[in-house]
UniProtKB/Swiss-Prot annotation:
The lineage of its organism: Eukaryota, Metazoa, Chordata, Craniata, Vertebrata. Conversion of fibrinogen to fibrin is triggered by thrombin, which cleaves fibrinopeptides A and B from alpha and beta chains, and thus exposes the N-terminal polymerization sites responsible for the formation of the soft clot. It is found in: Secreted. Glycans are attached at residue 2. One of its GO terms (cellular component) is extracellular region. The keyword Disulfide bond applies. Keywords: Adaptive immunity, Blood coagulation, Coiled coil, Disulfide bond, Glycoprotein, Hemostasis, Immunity, Innate immunity, Secreted, Sulfation. A long coiled coil structure formed by 3 polypeptide chains connects the central nodule to the C-terminal domains (distal nodules). The long C-terminal ends of the alpha chains fold back, contributing a fourth strand to the coiled coil structure. This is Fibrinogen beta chain. Disulfide bonds: none annotated. The modification Sulfotyrosine is found at residue 4. It comes from Lama glama (Llama). Heterohexamer; disulfide linked. Contains 2 sets of 3 non-identical chains (alpha, beta and gamma). The 2 heterotrimers are in head to head conformation with the N-termini in a small central domain. GO terms for biological process: adaptive immune response; blood coagulation; innate immune response. It comes from the Eukaryota.
Amino acid sequence: ATDYDEEEDDRVKVRLDAR
């Protein structure tokens, strides 16, 4: 991820998946 912490990265990926 970019500009995001490792923990945030997981949430971001999940959000993209839900999309």
